[in-house]
Amino acid sequence: MSEGKVQQKQQARRAEIVVAAQKCFAEKGLHGASVADIAREAGLSVGQLYRIFASKEAIIEAIVSEIVNARVGEMIDENHNLARKAAVLAGRIPTSAATKSDNYLLMEINAEASRNPRLREILMQADRRLKEEGGRLSQRNQPGLSDARRNAASELIAVLTEGAAYRCELSASTPVDKADLEALYNMIFDRLFDEQA
């Protein structure tokens, strides 16, 4: 078998393991899903899985990388469309089931990262990448912002995004007028990216 075919097969196997891990984490939680569960779901032995991923953390790193790549792709596609971002955060544009699942997993990884330095480093790398990409888009769209302001804006958007993800299920119990919420997000974004402020 050629080297290219071997790499293709390994990439396909990696992808199968990642999908199996996502399913196991969704069903059993990050702590409850074992490497044996993931291997079984992927149709592999534990030994075969360990030939592809050195640890459970390595699988989590691959999942986080996929989520970040998808989110960077969305950021690029949306081209710093803050009005759309406000509508999404307010819940006027529905979040896909896959995005909700990713959000729940990231929240669980974040909680575990307080006890696991490797997971903390994985999340910090992901956060840096998202902020760098967001900063590049912001630089293109608001070239007059200082780097300090751009960095602060990226942090605030991360806080708002993660907070909205956390609150999405909770807010159903105390309904909020989504149009009012969207208007508030737009007001924040207008002020945040005001080059004169």
For the regions a language model picked out, list residue spans one by one.
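N-terminal intrinsically disordered/low-complexity leader segments
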Residues: 1-12, 196-197
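Helix-turn-helix
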Residues: 16, 20-58, 62
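Hydrophobic alpha-helical connector segments
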Residues: 58, 62, 73-103, 153-157
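Short, basic, alpha-helical segments at the C-terminal edge of helix-turn-helix-like DNA-binding modules
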Residues: 65-71
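Outer-membrane beta-barrel domain signature
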Residues: 68, 76-80, 124-125, 130-138
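Amphipathic alpha-helical segments used for helix-helix packing
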Residues: 97-124, 170
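Hydrophobic/aromatic-rich alpha-helical bundle segments in the mid-to-C-terminal region
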Residues: 120, 124, 140-197
